[in-house]
């Protein structure tokens, strides 16, 4: 969704993934390979203004994404490239000054490794060199291909506190999250900070 949104706004976009999607976006350059390959990873920052990482820490990426992002931090800092990371909602506070979503949500054991990776990535960015311009995106609690949401063309932003609707639910569609991300790329407001986006 981020690739489609950015390309639709006229940006030059290169997508790095294991395989080209079944429905490629017109005008996007697709590079196939594994980002566990250090040489391929290094290419992501070449001729780039912004690198945005959206890798899921599942399958053979479980336990490896921290290593990839550590390398991206070094590569982006050396190249003077802005680095964005798509994380999770677990580090967001449920209320001002309150506990993290992770501390009160009682996640299923099978998703704990993914959650802990998201927390570790934010910590790695926070500990990165001051010269690196980064941003970390925490989507709403209900987000993903398995949670289809209405596309509204709108979103709300919070620094650290969970955003919910009138029913107390936190959700966002992939397309609207992509809009929030590309808006931040075009008009940066969150330098070395996280933001949370929801409907």
Locations of the language-model features?
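NAD(P)H-binding glycine-rich loop region in Rossmannoid oxidoreductase-like domains
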Residues: 21-79
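Oxidoreductase cofactor-interface core, primarily capturing Rossmann-like NAD(P)-dependent enzymes
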Residues: 1-26, 37-38, 59-61, 79-84, ...
């Amino acid at each position: 969704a981020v690739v489609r949104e950015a390309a639709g706004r006229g940006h030059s976009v290169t997508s790095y993934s294991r395989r080209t999607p079944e429905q490629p976006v017109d005008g996007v350059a697709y590079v196939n390979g594994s980002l566990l390959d250090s040489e391929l990873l290094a290419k992501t920052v070449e001729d780039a203004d912004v690198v945005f990482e959206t890798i899921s820490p599942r399958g053979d990426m479980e336990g490896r994404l921290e290593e990839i992002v550590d390398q991206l931090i070094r590569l982006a800092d050396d190249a003077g490239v802005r680095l964005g990371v798509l994380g999770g909602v677990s580090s967001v506070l449920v209320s001002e000054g309150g506990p993290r979503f992770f501390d009160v949500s009682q996640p299923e054991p099978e998703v704990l490794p993914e959650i802990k990776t998201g927390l570790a990535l934010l910590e790695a960015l926070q500990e990165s060199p001051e010269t690196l311009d980064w941003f970390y995106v925490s989507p709403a609690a209900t987000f993903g291909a398995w949670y289809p949401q209405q596309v509204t063309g709108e979103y709300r932003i919070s620094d650290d506190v969970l955003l919910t609707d009138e029913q107390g639910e936190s959700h966002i569609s992939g397309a609207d999250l992509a809009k929030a991300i590309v808006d931040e790329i075009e008009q940066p407001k969150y330098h070395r900070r996280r933001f949370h986006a929801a409907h």
